[in-house]
Amino acid sequence: EVAVNKLLEIIDNAEGKVILVGHSKNGIIVSQAAEYRSQKIEKLIYLAAYLIPNGKTQAEYSSQDTEGVLKPYVNRFPETNSHTLQPIIYKEGLYHDCDDDITDMAKCILSHESVATGITPLQLTEANYGSVPRYYIECSDDRAVTAFIQQKMYTETSCKKVYKMATSHSPFFSKPK
């Protein structure tokens, strides 16, 4: 909820409509924000992101993604209700088609994520969230959120258009153009 509220604050302070891009777990955040500010959002773009329907959780979908390589490398921190990935999996799991300097940078910038966003059911309505056009960019070589689960999500929750890129989970680093 903290992340959603921060995004809502940014949307509220923006002039005109915004385009939200959600990557990975942040698909959840942009979806919930669209429920609360649909009139301020031109479109939603999901980049290898969790596109979860009303009443469901990210955990329900990630548990079906049996080909993903990240799960054994998740460290949990109950005292802060957060988790993070072990750096040893960064290259193989997130950046396998990127230069090594990208993996080195990731070791400095990736941080803990709230567990709550993955286990809290989304509260979405057709009138609000459903009124915002959705687009999906599938990363077909993704080892974190595999093509299987990406396809399942954008098939269950329709998008105006689906684009496919033969990239890892991080095309903004491997194929920025």
Each language-model region and where it sits:
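Short coil/turn segments at beta-strand junctions that form active-site/ligand-binding loops
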Residues: 16-17, 42, 132-133
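Conserved alpha/beta-hydrolase catalytic His-Asp/Glu region
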Residues: 80-128
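Alpha-helical elements of Rossmann-like donor-binding domains used by nucleotide-donor carbohydrate transfer enzymes
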Residues: 2, 6-10, 32, 89, ...
